């Protein structure tokens, strides 16, 4: 069963800017989100202090961090940033 999607408010702004300025990265994110919704447990779980979250790399050095709410069958997109900033 596929999961539904929730996007953090701060990501809506980031994705809006990417849709206008960097369509290649925006399309890469869309493709990866579709894959995540089909099988979210395929992607790397993070360690403390980011436990219960997972990451997927997009366009090399950028990561998308998400959380899975199994009870509601929802994937929550939390953060998209450069690897060094996102995992601090």
Where do the protein language model's features map onto the residues?
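Enriched for short, Lys/Arg-rich terminal
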Residues: 2-5, 16, 20-26, 58-63, ...
